[in-house]
Amino acid sequence: SASSLGKAHDALVPMIEDGTIVNIESSGVRGKIGDAISHGKLKGLATMRSHGGRVRAIETGETHVDIAFIGAPSCDEYGNCSGMGGKTNCGVLSYAYVDADQADYVVAVTDCLVAYPNYPAEINQTKVDYVCVVDQIGIPEKIATGAAKPTTDQRKILMAEYCTQVVANTPYFKDGFSYQTGVGGASIASTISLSKIMEEKNIHMGLGVGGLTKPMCELLDRGLAYKLVDTQDFDLDAVNNVRTNPNHFPISAGEYASPMNKGAFVNKLDYVI
């Protein structure tokens, strides 16, 4: 039960083929795992949920997590984890919050063991059973790959322009509007084109919701956005912005979009691109 499965998880394919892994739950599957599932190699079911739906399933017990392995760019000997402060920073650890809360056992996996206490901690010592130190947990430079890269595709750029015109010509486009983009090239490009109209009309974004990329963080840095709330960072500029801008806040995937809580951020969105 992973928040997402991609090329980094290709090594799991032989375990799917030999029946070691029978069922998969995730919010998305790409790479060789996606190909294996598409060709019927998974013996059981592949269940896809939204990010908020995954939180709901775990919190209600529909999905039970026996053991959670949480990659932590920095961690101390007692399990205080952060998405910053190490050599493989990823920004925030939002999708792992529910695993840390609900799993029977929690293992923090880090390549940067720091002095105790590693504060502020996104996942704190009360949730973690074991700390495992490895050579490297990831490659930050490869965060912005595939769909997360800015596009040069003219078709996607045209789509972005059309999206921007729709946004700019609706009654919701006024000072304090709320906005979220996906990570696709057209979505990223739409933020860039929208920023020009915002500047021309002196309209400010009250709330930006992420996954976040450089263009959204630039809106915050330029004063065109007032607050960003963040569940995932899709490039190194967004990763670093968590640390440098005090109006850039980590939130949990449950706060973002769980249908079972009393007030998810998605309920307050004017636009999603």
Locations of regions flagged by a protein language model:
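Conserved alpha/beta enzyme-core scaffold
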Residues: 1-273
